[in-house]
């Protein structure tokens, strides 16, 4: 087991899918995702500064995140694997893949980039374009929880809000300076009812920086976390094709 994954990296399965949580969340955000994905296995990444790593300092850059994760999972990349993430997690996927290639390690067979536009075009989502001193982060957390059908106890709301604020500040500093090569294909995913990063903002420009395919799935911005059948089918189909190639 590594501190960078909530559970041990599975030793079985024909392929692995590593899930990187989006801003303000940790590995527990993947609680609706099964450990088995067809013939493959899913493994949720756990960044520092939250959940079971709450006492640790947050990373200061996307590169630091990539270096920390890769250092711990490098010896487990013994079969085809993918990275998947939603919204603000997407820049981390790109940084991780670029770092893996730079180190000469096995690269992901595919990235699944959900709810985020082309990285070189800038940032996406309202929290990247407002005065953070005037944003009620507690209300943001409550809105997310309500959309997913649960409530956080009051004592956890402030804690979650602080994590979200730290993550958004880091997100705002992202620049697409390290991107993986076109040898790492990207499945870009938009959602029909996404009001945070509308699908019309998701696709334009990806073909300029990646070998990308575009998929539109039914649901709102939070549907990714519910792991609908459409998304599961896409992941299993693409990874089955990857291991057969």
Kindly give the residue locations of the regions a language model identified.
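Domain-scale detector for complete catalytic domains at protein termini or as standalone homologs
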Residues: 1-84, 91, 95-245
């Amino acid at each position: 087991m590594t501190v960078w994954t909530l559970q041990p990296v599975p030793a079985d399965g024909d392929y692995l899918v590593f899930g990187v949580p989006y801003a303000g969340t940790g590995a527990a955000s993947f609680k609706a995702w099964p450990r088995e994905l067809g013939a493959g296995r899913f493994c949720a990444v756990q960044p520092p500064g939250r959940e079971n790593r709450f006492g640790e300092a947050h990373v200061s850059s996307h590169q630091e995140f990539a270096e920390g994760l890769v250092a711990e999972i490098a010896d487990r990349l013994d079969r085809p694997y993918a990275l998947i993430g939603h919204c603000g997690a997407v820049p981390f996927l790109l940084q991780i893949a670029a770092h893996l290639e730079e180190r000469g390690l096995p690269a992901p067979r595919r990235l699944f980039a959900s709810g985020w536009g082309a990285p070189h075009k800038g940032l996406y989502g309202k929290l990247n374009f407002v005065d953070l001193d005037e944003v009620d982060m507690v209300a943001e957390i409550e809105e997310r929880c309500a959309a997913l059908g649960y409530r956080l106890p009051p004592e956890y709301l402030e804690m979650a809000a602080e994590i979200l604020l730290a993550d958004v500040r880091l997100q705002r500093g992202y620049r697409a300076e390290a991107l993986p090569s076109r040898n790492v294909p990207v499945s870009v995913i938009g959602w029909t009812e996404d009001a945070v990063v509308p699908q019309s903002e998701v696709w334009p420009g990806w073909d300029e920086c990646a070998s990308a395919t575009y998929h539109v799935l039914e649901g709102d911005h939070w549907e990714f976390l519910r792991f609908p059948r459409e998304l599961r089918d896409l992941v299993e189909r693409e990874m089955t094709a990857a291991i057969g190639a």
